[in-house]
A protein has these predicted regions:
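Charged/polar, solvent-exposed surface patches and flexible loops
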Residues: 56, 91-95, 114, 118
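Phosphoinositide-binding peripheral membrane targeting modules
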Residues: 17-71, 75
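Short, surface-exposed secondary-structure junctions/capping segments
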Residues: 62-70, 95-111
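Alpha-helix boundary/capping detector
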Residues: 61-62, 80, 115, 119
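Canonical phosphoinositide-binding patch of PH/PH-like domains
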Residues: 72-95
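Generic hydrophobic, helix-prone segments enriched in Leu/Val/Ile
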Residues: 9, 15-16, 37, 89, ...
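Anionic N-terminal interaction surfaces
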Residues: 1-30, 47, 100-123
Length: 123
């Protein structure tokens, strides 16, 4: 039986985890201790990320609209999630982590431009 790290849940919403090749649909529990994801098919297939182990959390922003996909950077690696309520999740994360750890991710054009610039940079 999966035990939640959270004592108080601030937000419960549906979403998708892209940890494997196929996305897993499930529920997010955002609370006082951790960001948690529980798959719908198998509750024992879960991801618990304590707030203390998160280095950064970010999403793409276009104008004033936050995309549904967001990434969580931790000690263990990078986790990719999607939720219709990603803006609410990021607001709660900003309260728990601070403004410096919630970032705006670069767009595809910015990544390509950086790669091209590095190709022609003097070494």
């Amino acid at each position: 039986m999966a035990q939640s790290l959270n004592k108080v849940v601030d937000l419960q919403t549906t979403g998708t985890s892209y940890l494997s090749i196929q996305g897993k649909v499930g529920k997010f529990l955002v609370g006082d201790q951790a960001l948690e994801f529980y798959a719908d098919r198998n509750v024992e297939d879960y991801i618990q990320i304590p707030w203390s182990s998160i280095h950064q959390i970010g999403a793409n922003v276009s104008g004033r609209k936050v995309s549904r996909h967001f990434e969580v950077f931790t000690d263990q690696g990078k986790f990719l999630f999607a939720s219709k309520d990603s803006g609410k999740i990021l607001k709660i994360a900003r309260k728990k982590l601070g403004n410096d750890k919630v970032v705006k991710l670069p767009t595809l054009l910015q990544i390509i431009g950086r790669k091209i610039k590095n190709l022609f940079a003097k070494k």
